A protein has these predicted regions:
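A short, hydrophobic beta-strand element within the central beta-sheet of small alpha/beta folds
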Residues: 59, 63, 74, 78-92
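C-terminal output/effector regions of signal-responsive regulators
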Residues: 33, 123-165
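Alpha4 helix (beta4-alpha4-beta5 surface) of REC/receiver domains from two-component response regulators
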Residues: 69, 76, 88-116, 135
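Conserved acidic segment of CheY-like receiver
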Residues: 2, 7-19, 24-28
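Alpha-helical interaction/dimerization surfaces of two-component signaling modules
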Residues: 26-31, 49, 96
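Conserved phosphotransfer cores of two-component systems
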Residues: 51-53, 73-80, 100
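Acidic catalytic/metal-coordinating carboxylates
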Residues: 41-42, 63-69
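Acidic, metal-coordinating helix/loop segments flanking the phosphotransfer/catalytic sites
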Residues: 25, 39-57
Length: 165
């Protein structure tokens, strides 16, 4: 097995569903057994961890734990953040995550593929990382969102090519 860029990293996962946290931890540790994964099921616990610990990546659920409030705190501490959602899977939430400087926006349906997305969060800077996300999930987003969602939200990522090279 190839060594992952996540190996040895400290990751905080936050979701109000303990089974999602268990699945995230399992997926991460299978690929990167030397990762340290902390978990929080409440906003309050997440704030305590975010304020007291340095993380390489923070994975935040949007809905049940006030994810956008936690995103603001995590970004203010210069943590790389991956937003995770099922209920807020819409172009407006995606745009908000982008504007608030999250590094990626993952549908919970893609939890089985979380490690490559988190590796991209570590490998790529902000715009190149989002461009890579859209390249990987364009078909998925197109099937879930209205047509031209990217243009209507102003997230016309195809135009970022020159910026991201």
């Amino acid at each position: 097995m190839n060594e992952s860029i996540l190996d040895g990293k400290r990751i905080l996962t936050v979701d109000d569903e303990p089974e999602i946290l268990e699945l995230l931890e399992e997926e991460i540790l299978i690929a990167c057994p030397n990762c340290k994964v902390d978990k929080a099921t409440t906003y309050k616990r997440a704030v305590i961890l975010l304020e007291s610990t340095i993380y390489d990546i923070v994975v935040l659920d949007i809905m049940g734990v006030r994810g956008f409030d936690l995103l603001n705190l995590a970004v203010s501490r210069n943590f790389r953040v991956a937003m995770l959602t099922a209920h807020a899977l819409n172009p407006q939430a995606l745009k908000k995550a982008f504007e608030m400087k999250a590094r990626t926006y993952l549908p919970k349906e893609k939890l089985g593929e979380v490690v490559p997305f988190l590796e991209d969060v570590m490998k790529y800077e902000y715009l190149p990382g989002w461009k890579r996300l859209f390249e990987k999930l364009k078909g998925f987003f197109d099937s879930r969102f209205e047509s031209d969602w990217d243009k209507k939200t102003g997230l016309n990522w195809r135009e970022w090519g020159k910026v991201c090279l």
